[in-house]
Amino acid sequence: MLLSSSSSSPTNFNPNATYPRISKFAYLDPLELVIGDCEIGRLALVAPFAVCRGDEGTPIHIGDYSNMQDGVILHALETTSHGKNIDDRRYSAEGSLLKANNSEFKNGFAIYVGDKVSLAHGVQVHGPVYIGNDTFVGMNSFIFNANIGKRVAIGVSSTITDGVTIPDNKFVPPGSIIATQAQADALPPRVGSPYEKINSAVLHVNQELAKGYDARIIQRLATEIEGELEQEEMLQTGSPTGNPNVMARR
């Protein structure tokens, strides 16, 4: 449910104001901030103080069932300037880094966060970045200019940058700095690591929270609308409806 958002501001690199596109089945906390060209999928959860700024590098995609936990920041380097595309600033939905003259550039993403991805508290993702499905990014980690594969587990306070690609099914130990492809290729497997099953547990919790918070908000809105309708009826008829819930709220 979309609760707090705004359009981007027109600039020489993004001349058109763009509003976020949010699934009606996503949950966004009232204290989040989503600006501009951000797309958030079904049963995604955006927690308090999380920020998605689709006002410079665009667009930003957050897949179905993914979660942005408290204090997560998503932002990206500009993808176009004065109407011209910029090399290596967008990824395809399949994870290919795109050149400016690639016909797929217009359909690419400054940040692509796949389905069932967990971005834990305080994570910063600065595009160009690609994160594959079913990946966990641990608390206070930083990802900039990197391609993260599927089913990867990234330990807390890690840094991944300088154009590296983390292969599928890898484990990034806590506190790691991965800035060369040789470091990325030498990472151990996720299976058998302390983080082997962490994402499934985190996904379960956040999907339940998304459904629960959405249901609670819908019920509250329904109750408020019912009350407003009954108050309007009272004004028209001059007599109370007798609904004890409405009477109790007055």
Identify the function of each model-found stretch:
Residues 2-21, 55, 59, 63-64, ...:
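Glycine-rich hexapeptide-repeat left-handed beta-helix
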Residues 47:
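Small cofactor-carrier domains centered on a conserved lysine used for covalent cofactor attachment
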